[in-house]
Amino acid sequence: MALITPDYTVITSDVDEGKIAADTPAHLAQSLASAKARAVAKLHPADTVLGFDTVVDCGGEVFGKPQDEADALRMLRALSGRTHKVHTGVCICKGGRAAATVETTLVHFSPIVEDDLRAYVRTPEPYDKAGAYAIQGHAALWCAGIEGCYYNIMGLPVHRAAQLLREFA
């Protein structure tokens, strides 16, 4: 966010993500981001509020943050040697107006050796990340390439968010 503006505050919403449903993983990311932004905007109506949510789409199956080591291993094994999509929903709320969009990036993973997977899930890195990996961390070793926004994979599509902010200025 600091790339977009130096003046921001992070506020966590109280949205129950389990109650949000959508017809596609991309729509889910957008719906979650919208719900989060709208919840915070209700508490801070005079402010410009941005909400984000990222999901990993592996052949139509949604991967959020892993619950435990077994869940992280399941996700990473599914991603190994495959191309998947990372969808980040972005919603802006300001002065009673709102707009939402979604950014999608294709990520190509090389096959991952089982010992590397097991070592990785013993670190703290995968547990607060959709899809159980941090592209800017050790998982960069498995990334054969991307198509789209790199920052989207980290959960904040900088260009798309900056566009929305300019539109609402």
PLM features per residue range, with description:
Residues A2, A21-A22:
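Short, glycine/acidic-enriched capping/hinge loops at junctions between secondary-structure elements
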Residues D23-A169:
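Anionic-ligand binding patches
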Residues V10-V15, G51-T54:
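Short, conserved active-site loops that position catalytic residues or coordinate cofactors/metal ions
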Residues M1-I11, F168-A169:
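N-terminal G-site helix/loop of the GST-like fold
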Residues D7, D16-E17, R82, T123:
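A short linear boundary/processing microfeature
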Residues T12-I20, A140-W142:
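A short small-residue
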